Amino acid sequence: MEPELDCHHAAQARQAIAEAECVIALTAYKSEALEHADVLLPIAPFTETSGTYMSMEGRVQSFTAVTKPLGECRPGWKVLRVLGNTLGLSGFDFDSSEQVKNAIFGGQKPSTVVWNSLNNNLRELIEIQVKIKSNVLQRLGEVPQFQSDAIVRRSPPLQKTRAVQAPVAAMHSQLLTELGLDDGEMVTVKQGVASVLLKAKRDDGLPHGVVRVPTALPVTSLLGDLMGEIEVTRA
């Protein structure tokens, strides 16, 4: 994960890192936000290590490395194991990622544990009160197809595809009219104290009052919440 691109509030993440007394980063890639890091521990991406992922639907998927880690990189679980052992902590005596998985699932079948403990079924209904301001614009912060993680962001072939477009501030044609804007006009998009310049784009598939501004991009990483109040004015 790259905090300045992957966090829900990228600007807040940047500030927290900059103000922290000590920053230790386990990462496969060096990014701008990590200039504040006191220690960088190189870990291998998933292609260079074995491990297990659990998808959003609760599906457990294990895999093996396709190649050896580059240079001094090590699998993340090994780095954590060494740190745990060095600090004299218990629960870090593992020799393989398979042992880590077994410890998590307690020797049971992952599917059984997921079904009983980690599924998304509602156990009870909770009533919540939501206050929505109808007189302000709301940001819809989507993640572009090839900006979803550090690997695809650094893939030259993927970044040259037609799917990769310059970020825009998309909104319904009625909203464009109300704001006195034209399709294709440059606008100032502001969240909190941060603002960026983007091109306005008509998209009648969006609800009125919603402005779609992509996230996980350097140009929009200075903005605030992915889903929150937003201001749009002529540049």
Describe these PLM feature segments:
Residues 1-72, 79-81, 86-89, 98-235:
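A cross-kingdom feature strongest in bacterial/archaeal respiratory oxidoreductases
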Residues 94-96:
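Alpha-helix N-cap recognition
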